[in-house]
């Protein structure tokens, strides 16, 4: 069902000395109806206005896009377990799923190809947000003749209900690993990533062997629906956060009503490399009080020292707010290339020292309180 929202309304209301409003005397004007997808919430402000024969108060009603329709999901039985599913399918006995779709996520100027891959598991490999699937590419392991390839882990980029909201699919965010010879500069297909190329080259209907799900470090804590979650990613490390944010802002789950703050920092090379940017930008518009989104574009932006803008530079820029939020119990997550962590740790240590704090002690406390979540590869 669509909703009509009043974007602006002004009504002239006669009032007595005790400000009681006579219902029969309302006169409306300046009605504008826009965007069908929002349900209106009115805020009232009263100010005196001389209308000639009698003093009136003008009640100005401003409308916020505060009730955004969400998607109905099923089966809600996926909310019942108190513990996350773990290793339901072992690498030696993987589940055979089916490729639903493969979509290129990045633009032509991105350095490399990243794909969004939807897999149909028919409800047989359930998972929670923040977990990973193991993928076993077809073929033989060249280092172990007669044996299958090793398992490659990929963070799941959807909620437990999947992109179709029916609990039967899971999505992966995969960057194609291509090797270029450092001397000739030419691609050497024999050294390309086996699993990432298999996934990005897959077609709808192709079969895929998956193991898992695995992982508990990046699970989204849901004991406090008003908690703050600071999410830091480079590249495909944004995958689990897409799942978090869809659960927070897109899906209608009766037992989970998010009212806290989600703050995403995403570092990529350039605008063409941004992943799921349209989704995140929409959340920013729809939920300005509950979502913040900062991007670091290393090949297009400069930091305060004139160097490349990395995600740690954005962290330093907002460090006062971040540290205050951490002091108040915020969770902070890091996901992406392993090489991102040294620069981030150095930045956090430098900021802590400027604040007269010991970063080692603070980090120890964050880990003790289970506020610190890291998954790098």
UniProtKB/Swiss-Prot annotation:
Annotated positions binding NADP(+): 155, 175, 236, 268-269, 298-299, 308, 336-337, 375
Pathway: Energy metabolism; photosynthesis
Required cofactor names: FAD
Record bears the keyword Flavoprotein: yes
Transit peptide: 1-61
Biological processes annotated in GO: photosynthesis
Binding site for FAD: 152-155, 173-175, 179, 194-196, 236
Entry's Gene Ontology molecular function annotations: ferredoxin-NADP+ reductase activity
Domain of life where this protein originates: Eukaryota
E.C. number: 1.18.1.2
Function according to Swiss-Prot or TrEMBL: May play a key role in regulating the relative amounts of cyclic and non-cyclic electron flow to meet the demands of the plant for ATP and reducing power. Is involved in nitrate assimilation.
Main location: plastid
Catalysed reactions listed for this entry: 2 reduced [2Fe-2S]-[ferredoxin] + NADP(+) + H(+) = 2 oxidized [2Fe-2S]-[ferredoxin] + NADPH
Subcellular location: Plastid, Chloroplast
Protein's recorded name: Ferredoxin--NADP reductase, root isozyme, chloroplastic
Family note: Belongs to the ferredoxin--NADP reductase type 1 family.
Keyword field: Chloroplast, Electron transport, FAD, Flavoprotein, NADP, Oxidoreductase, Photosynthesis, Plastid, Transit peptide, Transport
SUPFAM superfamilies: Ferredoxin reductase-like, C-terminal NADP-linked domain (SSF52343), Riboflavin synthase domain-like (SSF63380)
InterPro entries associated with the record: FAD-bd_FR_type (IPR017927), Flavoprot_Pyr_Nucl_cyt_Rdtase (IPR001709), FNR (IPR015701), FNR_nucleotide-bd (IPR039261), FNR_plant_Cyanobacteria (IPR035442), OxRdtase_FAD/NAD-bd (IPR001433), Riboflavin_synthase-like_b-brl (IPR017938)
UniProt GO cellular component terms: chloroplast
Residues annotated as domain FAD-binding FR-type: 92-220
Source organism of this protein record: Pisum sativum
């Amino acid at each position: 069902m669509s909703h009509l929202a009043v974007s602006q309304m002004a009504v002239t209301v006669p009032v007595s000395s005790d400000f009681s409003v006579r219902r029969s005397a309302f006169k409306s004007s300046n009605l504008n109806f826009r965007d069908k997808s929002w349900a209106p919430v009115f805020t009232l402000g009263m100010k005196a206005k001389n209308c000639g024969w009698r003093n009136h108060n003008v009640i100005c009603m401003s409308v916020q896009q505060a009730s955004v329709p969400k998607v109905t999901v099923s089966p809600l039985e996926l909310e019942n377990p108190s513990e996350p599913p773990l290793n339901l399918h072992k690498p030696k006995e993987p589940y055979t799923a089916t490729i639903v779709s493969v979509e290129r996520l990045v633009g032509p100027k991105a350095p490399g190809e990243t794909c969004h891959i939807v897999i149909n598991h028919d409800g047989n490999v359930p998972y929670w947000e923040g977990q990973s699937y193991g993928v076993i590419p077809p073929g033989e392991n060249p280092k172990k003749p007669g044996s299958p390839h090793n398992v490659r882990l990929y963070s799941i980029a959807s909620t437990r209900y999947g992109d179709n909201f029916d609990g039967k699919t899971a999505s992966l965010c995969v960057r194609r690993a291509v090797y270029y010879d450092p001397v000739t500069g030419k691609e050497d297909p024999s050294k390309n990533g086996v699993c990432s190329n298999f996934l990005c080259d897959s077609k709808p209907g192709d079969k895929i062997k998956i193991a898992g799900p695995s992982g508990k470090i990046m699970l989204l804590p849901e004991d406090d629906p008003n908690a703050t979650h600071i999410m830091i990613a480079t590249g495909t490390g944004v995958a689990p956060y897409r799942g978090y944010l869809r659960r927070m802002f897109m899906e209608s789950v009766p037992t989970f009503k998010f009212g806290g703050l989600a703050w995403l920092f995403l570092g990529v090379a350039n605008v063409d490399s941004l992943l799921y940017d349209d989704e995140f930008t929409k959340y920013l518009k729809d939920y300005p009080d509950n979502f913040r989104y900062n991007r670091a574009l290393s090949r297009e932006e400069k930091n305060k020292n004139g160097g490349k803008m990395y995600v740690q530079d954005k962290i330093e820029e907002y460090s006062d707010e971040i540290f205050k939020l951490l002091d108040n119990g915020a969770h902070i997550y890091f996901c992406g290339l392993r090489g991102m962590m040294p620069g981030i740790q150095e930045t956090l240590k430098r900021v802590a020292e400027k604040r007269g704090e010991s970063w080692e002690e603070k980090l120890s406390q964050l880990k003790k309180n289970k506020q610190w979540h890291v998954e790098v590869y």
